[in-house]
Every structure is written in C-alpha cells, then in structure tokens.
C-alpha cells in the first residue's frame, strides 16, 4: 500500500473548496484527515464556550463527511508540535499538508511542526486557503503592506478572484494494521463539550458544519444580500448573513462566499441590489485587511499599532468595567448589546461599534480589556478581526480618527428608533416608552431596578478629548486629523 498523506485541519473544517485538501488529494487517494485538540488554545484565558461548542459541532460533521468519502478524521489531543510528527512517522506518511495560519501562535507552531517533519524525512506542505489573496499578494507599489483600508481595497478589488476548488472524493482509508499502530496516539471519539470543560446552550447564528454554512450562504444570496446595505446597520433586523462563525472556522470556503455573492450580483436587476452586494463583498475585504495586518504586524496582538496610544492614561476603573460587562451601564443600547453578547455569543456589528466606543471613550478603559472580554464570549471570535475592530474603535490602530466618539443615544435613535432591539434584550424595560429608552432618560420609578447612567456622556467625551490632546501635545507625534 502506498504511503498515506495526512491533512491537518485547523480553520478549514470542511471538505469542499479547501485548497490544501484538494492539493493533497491530487497526490494520493489515501488521504487521511486529522485534527488536534490543542490545550494551548482550548485552555487559553481567551477561549469562549460558544466557540468550543461551534468547533465541536463542525468536527462532528467533518467526521461524517470523511466517512462518506471513504476515509476518516483522526483526532488527537495534546501538543501538535509533538503529536503530529509522531503520528506521521508511525504511519510512514509521505507528507503532511495544511493551510497556513496568520496568527502569531499558529505561525510559530506550524514552523515547529514543519521542522520536526523535515527532520523525520517527511514533507510538510503549507498552502493559503482562508484568504482570497495571501498577504504577499496585496502590497503597495513600493512592496510594503498597507496600513490604510482605502488603498488596500483599491488594490484588492482589482485582483482576479480565485474560484472554488474541487471536493475530494473516492478516498482510501487506513488499513487495520495502520490503525492498530497509531491507536495509542488517538482519541477513540470526539470529547463532549462537558469533557472539554465547557458548557453552552446559547445557540449559534448559523448551525455548525459545512452543510448548514452552505445552506445559509445560498439563502442569504437568494434574498437578504440584495437589501444588505440599507438593512445592515439595524440590529433589530435580520440584515446580515450570520456567516461569521462559519468563516472563522472555515466551515465554508471564502471562494464559495465570493462566488455566491458574485452570482447574485450578476442576476440583480437594480442598482440598489448590486450596490448592496458590493458592500457585502467589501466586508470580506475588511476581513482580509485585518488578517493581512496581523500577518505583517504580529505585534498588533499585544498592543496598539500607533505608539502614542502606548502611553494613553486609561483610567481603568474596575467598577465601570464590571458594569459594562454585566450590562448595567444605564445606557439601554449599550446594555442590550452586551446582553446579546453574553447570552448568544454574538453581537451585531453596529452595536459592537457603540459598546466599544463607550468602553474606551466614555468609560476611558483600555481597549485591550474589551478585546479580551469579547474573545471570551464570541462564537466568531477571530484574533485579527477582533483586534482590528477594537483598535479601530479606540483609534489606536490603522485608519485612525482619534476623536471619533459615538453618542449612545444618537446611535439608538438612528438605528433602533422603535427600541425594538433594546426591548428584545432588556425585557425588564418593555414598559418604558421608546423615546425614553433611546435617550436613556428613564424616571426612577420607571427604572424598576435598572441602573441610572454610570457616567455622563457629554462630560466624559470632553474629558477623553482633553486627555488625548494633552498626550498628543506632550509627545508631538503626527496623527490623523480628528473629526471636525
């Protein structure tokens, strides 16, 4: 029997449109999947129960998909730097394929695994899959990575987009002798969520697995994508795709998503619909902008992109941070969003911007505390997107506007005018008139235990601006012009 090829799954929990997997299948029919439950990730302080639950659901379906194709998914638990080379050696594998990671830990881990495989005389083949364009494809004319989205988008959107690759079929499983040889290294079955040390019953924006992700993409592109632009900022409406967890874990291929949107664009009969589809495609470009940024500037994972913000005098008042995490700020739109996050593991993007601005510029708390809290709860928690979003809100990252400050009441009035979203997540305030919910000016009797505002927005934004201007003057570092 020919030497098998192993494919190591990480953020690509599917068989369809998987570049590394398709390349491995082109080399051999005896293609065996593997996934390693890495304690470095699962036991991280940033791990969210919702994310582990989604991962487990994806792995369950991936096991079934491999069986249907004639092969299997091997499960390991422990340090992949040791287990994967050991498994490959036991099987006398010809090669181990995987798709590249952009995160600092993943890149270091992959380098260690590749080095160990090379020492053992086994090929390590790494390909790009989670991006439409790899980080070295989208560079400025001088060969540097972009730090501003506009020029990045202009270059990115002009590049021809790759098409989905074929789904591997007619695979060959390991022999009984091979399975016996590696049995001591393997998990006999996928651990339950409880066995992994987590509990989750908050559901998901889209059910785990490739089948549900493909169905949701098709449903979205058949209908809602045509109204995406006018609907996407209203949290009470189902105006977004809900595909962020599937894209995070690779339950769906990015090329599949682009092709489906492009097909909808070609079939659209109005300029408004075509514009909406283009806006959704721009969100895919934002995703790649942040991933490219983290790849080129891995220090973003630990701190601000702009050095001025290293010295910003965050107040970091613990009582205010606790109130924010517990949806007790007294600002209904903020508290509704925070409750949605903690109960469902997901938050509407408009609300994300509101609560992030509130934490950093009303409460004057270091954005990194908000970033970590989100990662501890988000089902779609992605280091690059989460970090990029928080640095955007704090004005410490790329494309900064330091004095961009969201007024919670103005945001609620514009995007939740009937307070439908607020009442959905704060049912204890359903008796309050929408006008008062939006403004936050609720009478003491009407509050019925709901807190009064913990800070005065107008006063705090003045204090934040003063702190920023004082620091800027002291350091005299060029920054982007603030909003007028």
Curated annotation (Swiss-Prot):
Name recorded for this polypeptide: Deoxyribodipyrimidine photo-lyase
A molecular-function term among this protein's GO annotations: deoxyribodipyrimidine photo-lyase activity
Family that this chain belongs to: Belongs to the DNA photolyase class-1 family.
Domain Photolyase/cryptochrome alpha/beta, residue spans: 3-132
Region of interest called Interaction with DNA, as start-end residue ranges on this chain: 283-290, 349-350
Highest taxon in the source lineage: Bacteria
Subunit annotation: Monomer.
Organism the protein comes from: Synechococcus sp. (strain ATCC 27144 / PCC 6301 / SAUG 1402/1) (Anacystis nidulans)
Binding site for DNA: 232, 411, 472
Region described as DNA-binding: spans on this chain: 141-148
Record carries keyword Nucleotide-binding: yes
EC number: 4.1.99.3
Binding residue positions for coenzyme F420-(gamma-Glu)n: 36-38, 51, 101-109, 248
Function: Involved in repair of UV radiation-induced DNA damage. Catalyzes the light-dependent monomerization (300-600 nm) of cyclobutyl pyrimidine dimers (in cis-syn configuration), which are formed between adjacent bases on the same DNA strand upon exposure to ultraviolet radiation.
Any Pfam family the entry gives: DNA_photolyase
Site (Electron transfer via tryptophanyl radical): 314, 367, 390
Cofactor requirements of the protein: FAD; coenzyme F420-(gamma-Glu)n
């Amino acid at each position: 029997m020919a030497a098998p090829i192993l494919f190591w799954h990480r953020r690509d929990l599917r068989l369809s449109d998987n570049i590394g997997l398709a390349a491995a299948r082109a080399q051999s029919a005896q293609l065996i999947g593997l996934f390693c439950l890495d304690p470095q990730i699962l036991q991280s302080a940033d791990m969210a129960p919702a994310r582990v639950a989604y991962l487990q659901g994806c792995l369950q379906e991936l096991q079934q998909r491999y069986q249907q194709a004639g092969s299997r998914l091997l499960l390991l638990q422990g340090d992949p730097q040791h287990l994967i080379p050991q498994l490959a050696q036991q099987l006398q594998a010809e090669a181990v394929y995987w798709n590249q990671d952009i995160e600092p830990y993943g890149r270091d881990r992959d380098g260690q695994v590749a080095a160990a495989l090379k020492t053992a005389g086994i090929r390590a083949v790494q390909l790009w899959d989670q991006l439409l364009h790899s980080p070295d494809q989208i560079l400025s004319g001088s060969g540097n990575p972009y730090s501003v989205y506009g020029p990045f988008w202009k270059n990115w959107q002009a590049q021809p987009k790759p098409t989905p690759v074929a789904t591997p079929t007619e695979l060959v499983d390991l022999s009984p002798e091979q399975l016996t040889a590696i049995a001591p290294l393997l998990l006999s079955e996928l651990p339950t969520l409880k066995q992994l040390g987590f509990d989750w019953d908050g559901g998901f924006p889209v059910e785990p697995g490739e089948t549900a992700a493909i169905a949701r993409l098709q449903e979205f592109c058949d209908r809602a994508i045509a109204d995406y632009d006018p609907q996407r900022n209203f949290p009470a409406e189902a105006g977004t795709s809900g595909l962020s967890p599937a894209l995070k874990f690779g339950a769906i291929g990015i090329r599949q998503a682009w092709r489906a949107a492009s097909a909808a664009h070609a079939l659209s009969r109005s300029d408004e619909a075509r514009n909406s589809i283009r806006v959704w495609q721009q969100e895919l470009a934002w995703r790649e902008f942040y991933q490219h940024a983290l790849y080129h500037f891995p220090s973003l994972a630990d701190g601000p992109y702009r050095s001025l913000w290293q010295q910003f005098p965050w107040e970091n008042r613990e009582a205010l941070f606790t109130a924010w995490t517990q949806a007790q700020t007294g600002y209904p739109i903020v508290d509704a969003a925070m409750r949605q996050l903690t109960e469902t593991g997901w938050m509407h993007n408009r609300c994300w911007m509101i609560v992030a601005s509130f934490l950093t510029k009303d409460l004057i708390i270091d954005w990194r505390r908000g970033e970590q809290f989100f990662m501890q709860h988000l089902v779609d928690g992605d280091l690059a997107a989460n970090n990029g979003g928080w640095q955007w809100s704090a004005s410490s990252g790329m494309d900064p506007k330091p004095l961009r400050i969201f007024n919670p009441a103005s945001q609620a009035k514009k995007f939740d005018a009937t307070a439908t979203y607020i009442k959905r997540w704060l049912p204890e305030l359903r008796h309050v008139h929408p006008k008062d919910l939006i403004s936050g000016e609720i009478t003491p009797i009407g509050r019925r235990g709901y807190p009064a505002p913990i800070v005065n927005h107008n006063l705090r934004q003045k204090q934040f601006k003063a702190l920023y201007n004082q620091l800027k003057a002291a350091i005299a570092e060029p920054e982007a012009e603030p909003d007028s």
